[in-house]
């Protein structure tokens, strides 16, 4: 299944950003920042799919801010190879496409959170899919 992606020439496009400022944490409270990703693959036409990656940053307990960012890319595919995939999302999770998307989204989120209460949130440039 190595030939699913026909053309590695693509341009990631920012789809959506949702930043919500929340209340300050309680004094001496421990705040854990939860980070996770979701991926979606949808067919655009017979020879192309759209791959989107959404990264969520949510503090626990809910305070400071909440961020959700989605970036996507149109990928030209080999139709026969793609149609033979058992799970397209699982394929793209481990493809170079996911690495490009996550690297772009990490940079966007670091810039977006520069002026937050915690300063820039630098998240790992690897996809973090829930198990």
Features from the language model and the residues they span:
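N-terminal intrinsically disordered, cationic/polar leader segments
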Residues: 1-100, 107-131
């Amino acid at each position: 299944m190595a030939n699913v992606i026909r053309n590695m020439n693509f341009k990631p496009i920012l789809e959506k950003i949702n930043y919500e400022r929340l209340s300050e944490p309680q004094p001496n409270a421990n705040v854990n920042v939860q980070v996770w990703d979701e991926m979606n693959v949808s067919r655009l036409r017979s020879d192309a799919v759209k791959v989107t990656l959404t990264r969520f940053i949510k503090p626990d307990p809910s305070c400071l801010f909440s961020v959700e960012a989605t970036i996507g890319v149109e990928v030209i595919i080999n139709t026969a190879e793609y149609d033979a995939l058992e799970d397209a999302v699982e394929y793209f999770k481990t493809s170079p496409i996911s690495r490009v998307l996550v690297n772009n989204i990490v940079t966007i989120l670091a810039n977006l959170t520069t002026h937050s209460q915690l300063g820039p949130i630098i998240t790992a440039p690897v996809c973090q899919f829930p198990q």
